[in-house]
UniProtKB/Swiss-Prot annotation:
The lineage of its organism: Bacteria, Bacillati, Bacillota, Bacilli, Lactobacillales. CDD domains: Radical_SAM. Its cofactor is [4Fe-4S] cluster. It comes from Streptococcus sanguinis (strain SK36). Binds 1 [4Fe-4S] cluster. The cluster is coordinated with 3 cysteines and an exchangeable S-adenosyl-L-methionine. It catalyses: adenosine(2503) in 23S rRNA + 2 reduced [2Fe-2S]-[ferredoxin] + 2 S-adenosyl-L-methionine = 2-methyladenosine(2503) in 23S rRNA + 5'-deoxyadenosine + L-methionine + 2 oxidized [2Fe-2S]-[ferredoxin] + S-adenosyl-L-homocysteine; adenosine(37) in tRNA + 2 reduced [2Fe-2S]-[ferredoxin] + 2 S-adenosyl-L-methionine = 2-methyladenosine(37) in tRNA + 5'-deoxyadenosine + L-methionine + 2 oxidized [2Fe-2S]-[ferredoxin] + S-adenosyl-L-homocysteine. This is Probable dual-specificity RNA methyltransferase RlmN. Specifically methylates position 2 of adenine 2503 in 23S rRNA and position 2 of adenine 37 in tRNAs. Its EC number is 2.1.1.192.
């Protein structure tokens, strides 16, 4: 199976071209065709020799993904189900924000973190996505708009789709550097957010990388007992270890950390828990920000329900009174398979049911 050319960084592209006996500027031409002109085949690279195009075709594909399903919401959200070369499925989501087009990318097939409220973890991790498969998600979303003649450009990226990004650390870092490259898509580092469920040692590594992207931490609870009950990862990285890493990140980068907090009715959404959260954040208030997330119910996790608006606002008001910067996240795509992993999970379920029916037919 040939790799995607998107898996190469610009420096790797230069090294590849030189290994083929080509001049360095040929790599720059290929890079421009891919990321500025956004072609989908090597034959469209009209200033390259036939010999070089043949070498590219022999060693690479352009986009390794196949679009299976597209769901469009009334609010402009678009959810994509993509098929990987090995037949596995992933999700990507485009969200229209007041500041531009934001794409949420997937980094793994399945997830091993085991959050008890999440559709992504219903299917265990099967493999990591490589850098090219992550980049390809952005390129296919952009192609979706290019083909419609819509003069819109992906401006923001959130690495918050299926999987734990820091469990696929090297590929995610390579992806960030590829989409941030000023000769390519040139998506600003401060327009890119990488999320983690709390791999403390990787947060420390990330602090030392020198990348200027944003960090978000899926917290979802203000104490160890509650967090362990809804997020299995807290057994390995309890809040004390997690916050030591977060404080190291802030001291090293002087960058703000966003805390994601999903609102589960009568589980983690009480005023006392808001006070606990404010106390937990007291030493990093100036460089922290809490994102309160309305819960999208998942049929497989029917023990949870969405917090009523009055409970959300009481939680929000308590944080504000205690000096915590926070916001209630705007919802997107509530009229489609909105929860992370839900479209993929529902599609796989339908595919299994279809296969069973076909197998029993005479």
């Amino acid at each position: 199976m040939k790799p995607s050319i998107y898996s190469l960084t610009r420096q790797e592209m230069i090294e590849w071209a030189e290994a083929q006996g080509e001049k360095k500027f040929r790599a720059a031409q290929i890079w421009e065709w891919l990321y500025r002109k956004r072609v989908q085949s090597f034959e469209e690279m009209t200033n390259l020799s036939k010999d070089l195009i043949a070498k590219l075709n022999d060693q690479f594909v352009v986009n390794p993904l196949k679009q299976r399903i597209v769901q469009e919401s009334a609010d402009g959200t678009v959810k994509y189900l993509f098929e990987l070369p090995d037949g596995m499925l992933i999700e990507t989501v485009l969200m229209r924000q007041h500041y531009g087009l934001s794409v949420c990318v997937t980094t793994q097939v399945g997830c091993n973190i085991g959050c008890t409220f999440c559709a992504s973890g219903l299917i265990k991790k099967q493999r990591d996505l490589n850098n090219g498969e992550i980049v390809a998600q952005i390129m296919l979303v952009q192609k979706y708009f290019d083909e419609r003649g819509q003069d819109e450009r992906v401006s923001h990226i959130v690495v918050m789709g299926i999987g734990e990004p820091f469990d696929n650390y090297d590929n995610v870092l390579k992806f960030v550097r590829t989409v941030n490259d000023d000769k390519g898509l040139a998506i600003g580092a401060r327009h890119i957010t990488v999320s983690t469920s709390g791999l403390a040692h990787k947060i420390r590594d990330f602090a030392n990388e020198g990348v200027q992207v944003n960090l978000a931490v899926s917290l979802h609870a203000p104490n160890n007992d509650l967090r362990t009950s809804i997020m299995r990862i807290n057994r390995s990285f309890p809040i004390e270890k997690l916050f030591a890493a977060i404080e190291y990140y802030i001291e090293t980068t002087n960058r703000r950390v966003t805390f994601e907090y999903i609102m589960l009715n009568e589980v983690n959404d009480g005023v006392e828990q808001a006070k606990e959260l404010a106390e937990l954040l007291k030493n990093i208030k100036k460089l922290s920000y809490v994102n309160l997330i309305p819960y999208n119910p998942v049929s497989e996790h029917d023990q949870y329900s969405r917090s009523p608006k009055e409970r959300v606002m009481a939680f929000y008001d308590t944080l504000k009174k205690n000096g915590v910067n926070c916001v209630v996240r705007q919802e997107h795509g509530t009229d489609i398979d909105a929860a992370c992993g839900q479209l993929r999970s529902n599609t796989m379920k339908r595919d299994r049911e279809k296969a069973l029916v076909e197998n029993v037919q005479p």
